[in-house]
Amino acid sequence: MRVLLINGSPKENGNTCLALKEVAKTLNAESIDTEIISIGKQAVQGCIACGWCGRLGKCTFNDDLYYKVWRAVKDGVDGLVIGSPVYYGGPNGSLCALLDRVFYSLGHMLQYKPGASVVVCRRGGASAAFDRLNKYFTTMNMPIVSSQYWNMAYGHTSGQVAFDEEGMQTMRTLGHNMAWMLKRLNVAEDGHPQKERPTWTNFIK
């Protein structure tokens, strides 16, 4: 089994990465492979709602970062963890630009696979950013993996998050819970839930 972790921080080895590595280390100890993709400081194209992904099977803007995620999902992932620093009470905008494209073009390949979000902040806004990231999972029938608390940790300068003992424990618990869910789903014999044909409601006729 394999879990993809996306580091949504421009600092490739900052606090968000440290939190994700704590999750990954726990997953590895549970015999689950992991891969971390960092967005770094790359400029990220946002979705322009052109609809071409529906025809191509991938976003028409095939930049290196999107391609890395696309390739990882196509090669097969069993779970997804998204990490972000908190900016003005929300996730990093570059990360959201990437996720909009990923979930619109590849969301069908992530259905019924466990997802989790991780946020790191200096002081406040973590729960709002956490909620924002979880919305990606809830539009794609993805079970959300929880921990002993909301998946957040605190730190300002790089490395400080390691001193947040509760935050790091929350990350380890998240890793164990993700592993537990993956293993249970792997042995499930009843397949996926029954789905209805999607119905859309527009509020203006």
Where are these regions (language model features)?
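N-terminal beta1-alpha1 ligand-phosphate binding loop
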Residues: R2-E30
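Generic secondary-structure signature for well-ordered alpha-helical cores
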Residues: K25-I32, F103-G107, T138-M142, H176-A188
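Helix-loop-strand module that forms the ligand-binding subsite of alpha/beta enzymes
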Residues: L56, T60-Y149
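Glycine-rich phosphate/pyrophosphate-binding loop and the adjoining helix
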Residues: P143-K205
